[in-house]
Amino acid sequence: MALSTIVSQRKQIKRKAPRGFLKRVFKRKKPQLRLEKSGDLLVHLNCLLFVHRLAEESRTNACASKCRVINKEHVLAAAKVILKKSRG
């Protein structure tokens, strides 16, 4: 592997959550919704976890179909599975 493709495990991401954007979207879509101070962070974390699960599941689908590239079909199939699991 080339040196530029190796990412250090100890390096932490310093980017912050887009709190202003999330609050603006909440107010625009649901003006009657009242959230506590860290409610937007919980929504952001939930979105990140969903995207992470979606990436893992779609990668599994791509490997199962012996494809090196994750296609649209892999992502859609993974989304169906994840949304079924999250319904409870």
Swiss-Prot record:
SUPFAM superfamilies named in the record: Histone-fold
Biological processes, Gene Ontology terms: cell division; CENP-A containing chromatin assembly; chromosome organization; chromosome segregation; kinetochore assembly; mitotic cell cycle
Protein's cellular compartments: Nucleus; Chromosome, Centromere; Chromosome, Centromere, Kinetochore; Nucleus matrix
Pfam families cross-referenced by the UniProt entry: CENP-W
Top-level taxon of the source organism: Eukaryota
InterPro entries linked: CENP-W (IPR028847), CENP-W/WIP1 (IPR052484), Histone-fold (IPR009072)
SS bond partners: none
Single GO MF annotation: protein heterodimerization activity
Tagged with keyword Cell division: yes
Keywords attached to this entry: Cell cycle, Cell division, Centromere, Chromosome, DNA-binding, Kinetochore, Mitosis, Nucleus
Expression tissues: Highly expressed in ovary, liver, lung and pancreas and to a lower extent in breast and gastrointestinal tract cancers; such as those of the colon, rectum and stomach. Overexpressed in high grade breast invasive tumors. Expressed in many cancer cell types.
Gene Ontology CC, one term: nucleoplasm
Quaternary organization: Heterodimer with CENPT; this dimer coassembles with CENPS-CENPX heterodimers at centromeres to form the tetrameric CENP-T-W-S-X complex, which is a subcomplex of the large constitutive centromere-associated network (CCAN, also known as the interphase centromere complex or ICEN). Interacts with NPM1.
Family: Belongs to the CENP-W/WIP1 family.
Function statement: Component of the CENPA-NAC (nucleosome-associated) complex, a complex that plays a central role in assembly of kinetochore proteins, mitotic progression and chromosome segregation. The CENPA-NAC complex recruits the CENPA-CAD (nucleosome distal) complex and may be involved in incorporation of newly synthesized CENPA into centromeres. Part of a nucleosome-associated complex that binds specifically to histone H3-containing nucleosomes at the centromere, as opposed to nucleosomes containing CENPA.
Stated name of the protein: Centromere protein W
Organism: Homo sapiens (Human)
